[in-house]
Each structure stands twice: as C-alpha cells, then as structure tokens.
Amino acid sequence: MEDFVRQCFNPMIVELAEKAMKEYGEDPKIETNKFAAICTHLEVCFMYSDFHFIDERGESIIVESGDPNALLKHRFEIIEGRDRTMAWTVVNSICNTTGVEKPKFLPDLYDYRENRFIEIGVTRREVHIYYLEKANKIKSEKTHIHIFSFTGEEMATKADYTLDEESRARIKTRLFTIRQEMASRGLWDSFRQSERGEETIEERFEITGTMRRLADQSLPPNFSSLENFRAYVDGFEPNGCIEGKLSQMSKEVNARIEPFLKTTPRPLRLPDGPPCSQRSKFLLMDALKLSIEDPSHEGEGIPLYDAIKCMKTFFGWKEPNIVKPHEKGINLNYLLAWKQVLAELQDIENEEKIPKTKNMKKTSQLKWALGENMAPEKVDFEDCKDVGDLKQYDSDEPEPRSLASWIQSEFNKACELTDSSWIELDEIGEDVAPIEHIASMRRNYFTAEVSHCRATEYIMKGVYINTALLNASCAAMDDFQLIPMISKCRTKEGRRKTNLYGFIIKGRSHLRNDTDVVNYVSMEFSLTDPRLEPHKWEKYCVLEIGDMLLRTAIGQVSRPMFLYMRTNGTSKIKMKWGMEMRRCLLQSLQQIESMIEAESSVKEKDMTKEFFENKSETWPIGESPKGVEEGSIGKVCRTLLAKSVFNSLYASPQLEGFSAESRKLLLIVQALRDNLEPGTFDLGGLYEAIEECLINDPWVLLNASWFNSFLTHALK
C-alpha cells in the first residue's frame, strides 16, 4: 500500500500527508491505510479549489488554462494541509476580516464567494452515515459539509453542492480510479474496512448455549429469533420519519414529534405557599465562631479541651431567654438543655483532670429533645402477619413552600472570600506521575482561588461535624455525648486558629443499617436576630444568651448573641458522605480543568498560566434576571465550588429528581440554541416530572428559579 500511495499521488501531497501523520505520532509505513486516506482527502481538497476563481466583478469563474494578465482571486482558501498553527492563523484572519463565526474545529476550505467554511469528507462507507458523524462532531450551523464516497455518491448540507456538476464529476472520477487501482492490487478490501474498524468480531462470533437462550428470551415483543431482530435493526433506516418508525416498533406507541421552537418552552411553575425554611445540618452564613489564636493550651487538639478554651474567650454570657419559640416543640426544654450544657461544662472545669469526652446526664429535657423512648415498639412480623388491618402509617403530603430570598443570600455568601485559609495545599491529593506537573500547577492555582472561600469553610466544618458524630455514634452508642462543633483555619498572617460554632448532643445510636437514624440536638452561636426572617427559622427555637462587643468603624458596639437550637437527625450513610465533602473541591477543580482544556485545545498549548493570571478576562458565571453574570476566574472557581458544596449540604430526593429531569430540558434548549432543530414528544410529561420535584426544598427552588432565568435569556 505504501508503494501504491507514493506512485499514485503527487509528491507534494505525499509529503504533506507524512508531515500530518508525524505531527500526531503516527507512522506512514505502519498505518498505510490511514496514509492513503489522508492523501486522498488532501487531493480532493485541492481538486475542489482548482480552477475556481473570482473575477474583478466578484463573479465566480472557472479558468483552466492560466491567463497571466487576468486579475483573478482564488475562490477557495485551502486550510487543510497546513500545519496546525498556520491553519489556525489563516482561520483567525478570515474570521477577523469577514466577521464569520470562528469554527471549533479546523475546517478544510474557506469559500470567498459563499462566505463560509467547508468541511470535506471522503468516505468508504455510506455518505449519510459519515455526514451525520461529521455534523455531530462539528455541531456548527455555519460550516458547510460536503461528503464524497468512492462509489460516486455525495451529500452536502441542505443539498447545496457549492461546485458545478463538472468539477464534482472530476473528483468522483478520480476517487473511482483510486478505488479501481487499489482493487487491482488487492488493497481495496483492507482499505475499505479500515475506516470503520469494520468486520466486528460479532459478525463471525457464534453465540451459543446459555447466552443464546438469554438473547432469545430478551428480544422485544414480535421477534422470533436473534437473527430476525438483527436483520430488522440492520435494515432500520435512520432517515425515515420517527413517528412511522415508532408505530412500526410497537402498536401502543403513538408519539407525535413536535418541533421545539423558541416559543415552545414555558417557565417552570414554582410552588406557592409560605416561604421555605432553612434545613441545613448546621448554620451557614448566620454562624458565629468563638475563636482562639495560636492555641497552645494543655490538651490542644482534644475537642472538649479546645471547646472549653474557646468558651472562656467570651465574657458576655447572660441569663438565657427564648426570643423565637419553635411552633411545635416544648420550648422550655430547649432552654433547660442549654442551661444544662453550661452547668455541665462548669462541672468539668471543677474536676481535677478534664475528661476527653463528656456524656450528658439523661435529663427529661434531653430525653424529650432526643426522642428517647419515642420510637414505636418493634414487633416481629411473625407475630402480626395475621392481623387483618395491618397497614403502613399514613404520612402527610409535604406542604408546598415558595422560594424565599434568604437562600440566594446564602449562596452569594458561600461564594465570598473570608479572611482565613481553610485548606492547606495538600487537601486535594499528591502527585504520583510525571504528567502531573501541569495537574499540580492547576491544583495550586485553584487552591489559591478557593482556600479562603466561605464554601471551603463549610466543607471543613461539615467534615469535622460528621466525623465527630459518626465516631461518637459508634463509640458511645447509649450515651448522650456532648460534641463540640469545631473548625481550624489559618489567619492572613499564617497563625493557627481554632473555632467553636456551638455544640451537638447526640441521642442513642444503635446504627445497624446505613439508613438507621441517630437523633441529635444542635445549639449554635449566632448574631442574626431570628425575628428578621422568622420563616427561615421555622424549625428552630432561638435563645438570647449573651451580649457581644464588636469592633466597628464607629468604635465598639454591643450586639445580642443568640443560640439557634433544633432537634435533627442523620444516618450512617449521610455521615459517610458528609465526611467526604472534600470531594466538592475535586469536582469543581475538574469543571475548571475542562474549561482550561477547551481553551488549550484551541490555542494548542497549555493555557493554565494565562487562564489564572490574565486578570482582565471575565467568564460567564450564571444567569440571573439581569442577564448573564460574568466574573473573574477566581469568582468562577468559587461559584462552582459553592454549587457543589450546596448540592452536598442540601442533598435530597427533590434535588436528585430536579437535576436529572431538568437536564433533559436543558439539553433540548441547548440544541435549539445550536440550531439543531430539536423535536420532542410529551413535553408536558417532562415538565410534570421536573415540577413534581419543586415542593419545599430551598436549594431546589433556587435552582428552578435560576433555570427560569436561563430559559428567558437562552430564548431571546
């Protein structure tokens, strides 16, 4: 084959093909079929442009014998065959001078008469299959596709063949000749099959025995055998009308494919009702920390010791009182529980040696708060299977809730920078291979952008709380253990800092299954007055427990300090995921990496440095009612991280359903934006599936409202 290529093609074409293959690390001596294919493609591109000119009047003309005096301009710019850098330079300059949209992939030609890029394809298979592959790959309405086959067939975008009949006939004749020359040397079959990696094993592979029986059993209805089904699938023409095919497949299906136009989609309907309430496992933007810098006390690192040390930094404690009762709870019990914590911490200090853990006395208020003896008695199924009216509890439908503004504020806060660093460089893992110097560079840049982010604080807080709670649940199953909520960070000056957010008291925790629940009471410090947004704090009982002096621009001011208390519960599986919240860093890093990769493949060099250091460039972050929001690369990193963290903090079945179903609608809208003329059936059913997930979850409702903003802007 190699000899044939060198005899059959012009030496210039052969040289260009060798160069192209070497650029991709391929050897023309080994991959001879590929060598022949590249030469053929190059020759077709050159023949396409040969003899076609534009005269001084701008008309397209064909000139076969050169008149040296004519002022003629080549009609086609040849891009194929140039090295990649040069090719992109040509494409960029064409785009700059003509205003044509820049293609994502290098095209083969540019047509100055029709003002469009052309992608030429030469296939040994059926033209329409190859055409669809090309169209799917380049996904651009602007680039014109023209496919030729060795059998004389052709296919072009909108059946617009660009060239006159004669020029195309010349190309087809040449392809036919190449095919005959190959066939006469016994090279054609191997060449023809190499395009598809054809002759799949399956064709010669006999399925026998159990596999054969399973195959026959799992056929769709109305097919008697595997052969019968296979023949049907092979003959299934993809370009027929879909409705007909569907009815052919099953008598029950009658889908009408409706075109999806800019006017088709409507906004998602968000539920009405009282505003939604906070449901995270710990306070986010409203949390307050009692902190010690450069901790060096005895027992530093033992949570209880650290907590007592942090509590001692505050001098404004006062007699607690309830400022926002919990609607359904016995609020006095919350008050008594906090007083009990203060008293028992005081007792610890009076002991000679402070213990490492503290189990609370099982008082009536804690038993109430932790649901002790509240679980219905379990009865063996054998003893009750004869009971006639055995049934599951009736559970109430959840009450629909409307979107409240606090959840957007929470998200905005999560994207902000704090004045402390919450992760060290190695939180994302170490290098293990040489390729990873680029990876570590990206990781270090990314870490620098997110280490001070509030979402990162939430990650470390979540990891700490879940780890401590899971440990205590396994180690002290019957005890009401007091668990401090702690995090560690570094100040701007690099000093270590230990923070106390409040406490958790866990209930009995005999967790056999992943989903068995452990109850706990959380009590968290805050400066937020709950009376400002009472709907947000529906599930909480809030006490006022002290006054804090704050330094402000106008000097010291005293602010009331609140304690947010609620009963809550979690399970082994939820704690396991909570302990792995650092994965959010990895997920958002990967999203940023794919942005860098896209940029690098266009520029054909690694763009990591430019990506993070070009401070002037802005990137799309998301859609708001105002339009597409843009920001620095750091802001993009922090926003992606915050989204990932909120997906973890507010994980729920509603979120799972909304993400899966709304993604389908998103893909349809994106297809419309890319002018792919999408069609849909049962769009109403899709809307129903999305909207049945919009019930009362704040994070899901916020995502739905973002989705509506996206719809508005995408369809303008």
UniProtKB/Swiss-Prot annotation:
Q: What is its EC number?
A: 3.1.-.-
State any GO BP term from the record.
cap snatching
List localization entries. Host cytoplasm; Host nucleus
Cross-referenced InterPro entries: INFV_PA, PA/PA-X, PA/PA-X_sf
Chain ranges for the short sequence motif Nuclear localization signal 2 (NLS2) as given in the UniProt record:
184-247
Motif Nuclear localization signal 1 (NLS1) boundaries: 124-139
User: What post-translational modification does the entry describe?
Assistant: Phosphorylated on serines and threonines by host kinases, including human casein kinase II.
Asked if the Swiss-Prot or TrEMBL record annotates the protein with the keyword Manganese, the reply is yes
Residues that hold Mn(2+) 1 according to the record: 41, 108, 119-120
Q: Which cofactor does it need?
A: Mn(2+)
* Protein family membership: Belongs to the influenza viruses PA family.
State the protein's name: Polymerase acidic protein
Question: Which Gene3D superfamilies does UniProt cross-reference here?
Answer: Influenza RNA-dependent RNA polymerase subunit PA, endonuclease domain
Record's function text: Plays an essential role in viral RNA transcription and replication by forming the heterotrimeric polymerase complex together with PB1 and PB2 subunits. The complex transcribes viral mRNAs by using a unique mechanism called cap-snatching. It consists in the hijacking and cleavage of host capped pre-mRNAs. These short capped RNAs are then used as primers for viral mRNAs. The PB2 subunit is responsible for the binding of the 5' cap of cellular pre-mRNAs which are subsequently cleaved after 10-13 nucleotides by the PA subunit that carries the endonuclease activity.
Q: Which organism is it from?
A: Influenza A virus (strain A/Chicken/Scotland/1959 H5N1)
